[in-house]
Structures are given as structure tokens and as C-alpha cells.
């Protein structure tokens, strides 16, 4: 959420930032709504002040035995008490209306973010590795998995409908190995604290990370009103909600390996075959809680941590700087890691690492106490996939495919595979 004081002082800057994102100007309507709210607040404060003063004057009038003045003041206090509830209700309604409007405004992009409309305007920041060179034809992951006999979409559909997958035998183990490798890397070498947290959260949590109120249709909700997490970003970031941290203890770095649940409401007709776009998938999430000064450097560090996963797996990938039109709602700057999929003859997103400024900190009322001036400031937050496990599985299948249809296990995963070095067709 943006600071209304900043919007009041910088209306042109807000509208310019919204224009970069392809959104309509909002500063004028927000400032007008804020003026109405502030007027209602002032009215309520004036009435309260006059009521309190009149109450004191009653005592003085009584002490002076001026009963006529005392009665007049009592009548005034009574009238003020009658007026106050309506003014206070107006204040509450206008405050709620303003907060709702602010909660639907996207974050302000950094100045160095390329301006663009969609993914076609993203910039290649760096490319790592090379495409595999084979004598045999590449295949898509679902062709490989089904031919091996360990990837079953038909039974998954019988259980749950479309956009689900059943993995068995060595493919199930490979998925588990990938997730375990990621968690081990980030905790043992990258300094992240592993967290086991709930998969269902309250409204306040998804509001804090900015999925609510704007993106409710992308989420799954339980009958008792809780939300299935679309990413562990929600739980990891909200660990510090309503807290005041010491600046000396920052940054906090959390990681979790969890299922994620997404309705894919806007994805009809996209990636309908295979595992690329699922309602339920495993993901290793990275979250950092920092002060204002450290956030940009932390963003580069987090992205490097995610890249290291792909480097150690020997996968060809590129890092993209997203343009303003392709960035997430809460982001100030985002790097996407796109892994090469030979079967699709294309790069596909496997990780997204974003720096959010104090956008989420303000929504969560999460603050830190400055080590010098001791004032409380909103924390800055970052999140990234380190990485999406299912998409990593896809990349391994397509990049480590052998001519006979078997799949070689990447060396870094061998300690997790119980002696298995290759996945071959089921007997």
C-alpha cells in the first residue's frame, strides 16, 4: 500500500508511475477522498474538544453557583453527544473507503525498470549456460513422463479434474529430491531459516502480501473463510505482521518448501497439457525482511541464490528484468529466471524475484526501530521462488533426456535418489 501523505505531496509522480504500468490516473480522486476524510476527522476532533471544554465549564459554572449557565452548557454537551456518532461514522466510512482505494493501487516501479506493455518488452539481463546439443529429437515433459510410465494425468483428472498430476515411483522421488536439494542449498549455504508454516491463512495475511482484495479470484477459499496459500510468500512475509523489529537484527531471511494453490482464473486455454500450469504445485520460496537501505542489494543477492539452483542443476537459463507492464502488483522491480525447455523450444519462467519496498510492510503494519534515531519505519520486503519444483522437474526431464527415452539424474541430485542414476521406462 502506498502512503497517502506521499500521494498528497506527489500527485504527478503517482499518475506518471501508473501510466508506466498502463493504468489510469488516480491522484486527483484519491486526494479529494483524503480531503473529505481529513475534514470529517477535524470535525470529530472539534466536536470532542468543544464537548470536553463545555464539560469543564459546567463545573466552573456550578462552583460559581451560576445555574443558568450550567444548564445552558449541559444542553450544549447533550447536543454535541447527539452529533458525534454521525460524524464519527462518517469518519469511519471515509477511512475505510480510502484504505480500500489505496489497497487497489499497484506499487511504484523503480526508475531503472524498463517501461513497456507486456512480456515482449522485458530485457534480457544475462544468459547462463548453453542449449543441450543432441542427435535425437527433443520431447515435451508430458511425452517423456507418460512414456516412462510415471506421470499420469488421466488418474489425476479422475481424482481432481484438470490441471493436476499424479507422479509415481522415481518421478515422485525426483520431485522430492529437487525440493530437498533447494531447501538444503538455501539453508546451508545461503543463510535462510527454514520455516514450516500453515497452508491456510486468514484474510489479513493475504491482504498483507497484496493478494487481497484485488486478486481474490486467483485464490482458493475454504468453507470456513480461510485461504489456501498461493505461495509461501504469504506466510513467510506475514511472520512479522504487527511487529516492531530491531534494525540490528535485519535482514531476516526465511525459506519454506510448500504446496501452492492457484485457481488460474485468467489462464483458460494456456498450457492445458502437462505440468506447467497447475492448481497445486510444490515451490521453494525465499523471503527477506530488510531495512530501506539494504533492500536493493538484497534483491540482487536473492536473485543470485535462485540462479544458483539452476546453475548446479546444469540448466541453461536467462535472467530477465521485467518491464513496468509485466511486473507484479506489489513489486518495485522484478527479475524472472527463465529456463530453457527443449521440448517447447522456448524459455519458460521458473522463478520470479521481487523487491517490494515498504508496500507490504505498510499493509502488515510491520516496522523496525532505527538503530540511530530509534524511530519506527516500515520494513522493506522481498520475495522469490528458489525455485518452482514442478517446473524444475520439467526442465530436468527435457534437458536430461537420452536417445532411448531414459532420463539421466543430474549429479547434484544423486545423494537424494537412493542410488538411482537414471530413470528408465517402467517394467
From Swiss-Prot:
Pathway: Aminoacyl-tRNA biosynthesis; selenocysteinyl-tRNA(Sec) biosynthesis; L-seryl-tRNA(Sec) from L-serine and tRNA(Sec): step 1/1. GO terms for cellular component: cytoplasm. It is found in: Cytoplasm. Keywords: Aminoacyl-tRNA synthetase, ATP-binding, Cytoplasm, Ligase, Nucleotide-binding, Protein biosynthesis. Its main location: cytoplasm. It catalyses: tRNA(Ser) + L-serine + ATP = L-seryl-tRNA(Ser) + AMP + diphosphate + H(+); tRNA(Sec) + L-serine + ATP = L-seryl-tRNA(Sec) + AMP + diphosphate + H(+). PROSITE patterns: AA_TRNA_LIGASE_II. L-serine binds at residues 231-233, 285, 385. InterPro entries: aa-tRNA-synt_IIb, aa-tRNA-synth_II, aa-tRNA-synth_II/BPL/LPL, Ser-tRNA-ligase_type_1, Ser-tRNA-synth_1_N, SerRS_1_N_sf, SerRS_core, tRNA-bd_arm. Disulfide bonds: none annotated. ATP binds at residues 262-264, 349-352. Its EC number is 6.1.1.11. GO terms for biological process: selenocysteine biosynthetic process; seryl-tRNA aminoacylation. It is an enzyme of class 6 (ligase). One of its GO terms (molecular function) is ATP binding. Catalyzes the attachment of serine to tRNA(Ser). Is also able to aminoacylate tRNA(Sec) with serine, to form the misacylated tRNA L-seryl-tRNA(Sec), which will be further converted into selenocysteinyl-tRNA(Sec). This is Serine--tRNA ligase. It comes from Rhizobium johnstonii (strain DSM 114642 / LMG 32736 / 3841). The lineage of its organism: Bacteria, Pseudomonadati, Pseudomonadota, Alphaproteobacteria, Hyphomicrobiales.
Amino acid at each position: 500500500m502506498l502512503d497517502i501523505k506521499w500521494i498528497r505531496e506527489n500527485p504527478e509522480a503517482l499518475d506518471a508511475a501508473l501510466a508506466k504500468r498502463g493504468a489510469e490516473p488516480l491522484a486527483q480522486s484519491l486526494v479529494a477522498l483524503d480531503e473529505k476524510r481529513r475534514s470529517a476527522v477535524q470535525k470529530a476532533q472539534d466536536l470532542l474538544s468543544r464537548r470536553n471544554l463545555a464539560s469543564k465549564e459546567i463545573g466552573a459554572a456550578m462552583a460559581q453557583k451560576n445555574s443558568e449557565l450550567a444548564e445552558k452548557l449541559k444542553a450544549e454537551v447533550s447536543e454535541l453527544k447527539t452529533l458525534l456518532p454521525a460524524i464519527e461514522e462518517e469518519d469511519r466510512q471515509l477511512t475505510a473507503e480510502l484504505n480500500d482505494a489505496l489497497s487497489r493501487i499497484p506499487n511504484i516501479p523503480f526508475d531503472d525498470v524498463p517501461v513497456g506493455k507486456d512480456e515482449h518488452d522485458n530485457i534480457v539481463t544475462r544468459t547462463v549456460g548453453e542449449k543441450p546439443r543432441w542427435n535425437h529429437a527433443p520431447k515435451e515433459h508430458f511425452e517423456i513422463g507418460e512414456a516412462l510410465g510415471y506421470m499420469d494425468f488421466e488418474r489425476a483428472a479422475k481424482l481432481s479434474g484438470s490441471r493436476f498430476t499424479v507422479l509415481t515411483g522415481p518421478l515422485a522421488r525426483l520431485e522430492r529430491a529437487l525440493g530437498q536439494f533447494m531447501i538444503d542449498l538455501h539453508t546451508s549455504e545461503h543463510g535462510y531459516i527454514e520455516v514450516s508454516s500453515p497452508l491456510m491463512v486468514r484474510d489479513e495475511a493475504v491482504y498483507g502480501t497484496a493478494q487481497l482484495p484485488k486478486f481474490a479470484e486467483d485464490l482458493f477459499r475454504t468453507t470456513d473463510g480461510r485461504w489456501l496459500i498461493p505461495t509461501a510468500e504469504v506466510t513467510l512475509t506475514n511472520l512479522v505482521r504487527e511487529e516492531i523489529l530491531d534494525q540490528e537484527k535485519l535482514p531476516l531471511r526465511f525459506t519454506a518448501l510448500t504446496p501452492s494453490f492457484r485457481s488460474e482464473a485468467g489462464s483458460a486455454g494456456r498450457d492445458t497439457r502437462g505440468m506447467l500450469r497447475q492448481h497445486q504445485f510444490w515451490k521453494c520460496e525465499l523471503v527477506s525482511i530488510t531495512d530501506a537501505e539494504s533492500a536493493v542489494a538484497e534483491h540482487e543477492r536473492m536473485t543470485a541464490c535462485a540462479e544458483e539452483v539452476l546453475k548446479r542443476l546444469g540448466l541453461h537459463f536467462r535472467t530477465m528484468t521485467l518491464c513496468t507492464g509485466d511486473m507484479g502488483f506489489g513489486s518495485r522491480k522484478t527479475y524472472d529466471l527463465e529456463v530453457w525447455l527443449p521440448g517447447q523450444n522456448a524459455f519458460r519462467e521458473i522463478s520470479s524475484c521481487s523487491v517490494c519496498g515498504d508496500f507490504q510492510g505498510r499493509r502488515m503494519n510491520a516496522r523496525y526501530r532505527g538503530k540511530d534515531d530509534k524511530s519506527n519505519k516500515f520494513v522493506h520486503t522481498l520475495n522469490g521462488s528458489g525455485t518452482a519444483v514442478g517446473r524444475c522437474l520439467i526442465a530436468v526431464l527435457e534437458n536430461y533426456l537420452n536417445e532411448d527415452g531414459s532420463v539421466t539424474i543430474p549429479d547434484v541430485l544423486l545423494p537424494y535418489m537412493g542410488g538411482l542414476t537414471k530413470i528408465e521406462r517402467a517394467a
